[in-house]
Amino acid sequence: MDIGIDLLAILFCVGFVASFIDAIAGGGGLITIPALLMTGMPPAMSLGTNKLQAMGGALSASLYFLRKRAVNLRDIWFILIWVFLGSALGTLLIQSIDVAIFKKILPFLILAIGLYFLFTPKLGDEDRKQRLSYLLFGLLVSPFLGFYDGFFGPGTGSIMSLACVTLLGFNLPKATAHAKVMNFTSNLASFALFLLGGQILWKVGFVMMAGSILGANLGAKMVMTKGKTLIRPMVVIMSFMMTAKMVYDQGWFHF
């Protein structure tokens, strides 16, 4: 598939903007996947190429959070293992079953997350009581978070952040940092399976990855410096935008 230099430049910018937003609030795939599909790329290859570029952004943001000691891998290694396994299973299943019913339910889930953050203004301002240990979170929650990202994906960052706030008691910047490390892990598992299936356009993926790395690094810095004032409105806005796009794509507004 031949992609011109002008289109590659646009995709570089798309990767930058999407990863900047994704590092703060999630929802970057809302931008990158339609952009890839508009190039005429087959859907499966669009998903595989998107996982490649998303890995660059997720890794860049994750390394930044690790350098700033916002995340301690010794605490969450068990969580990451189960996120990886869940994502691998989700990626395998998405290639073999009908997801029509799931797609109809998903907008309500994403909308609920946005409304939850909107109407609980103090949620995540400070660390709260931890409801689940890291071990139980890894066993009971992580597989489903990874499965969702591998199976479908939109809003994964927001869902992971909400789980960290409500179940692990993290403040919002800390939850966002941990969600990004989990998201990188799930992307890695999904990418590996798309790689085995040959569903990646490398040139496009690497160009978008370059933009993604720059955007994610800038977004991660914003989380650490302006987290409490920036993350909540971004999560709410992206949740509403994802909901609107999903219901539009399903034809709810087509008369």
Task: Provide a role label for each language-model segment.
Residues G48-I101, N187-M234:
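Selective hydrophobic functional segments
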Residues F144-P154, S190-G198, M242-F255:
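Hydrophobic alpha-helical transmembrane segments in multi-pass integral membrane proteins
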Residues M1-P42, D127-T176, F206:
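Selected transmembrane alpha-helices and immediately adjacent juxtamembrane segments
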Residues L73-W82, L106, K129-L135, A177-M182, ...:
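Cytoplasmic-side transmembrane-helix entry/capping segments in multi-pass membrane proteins
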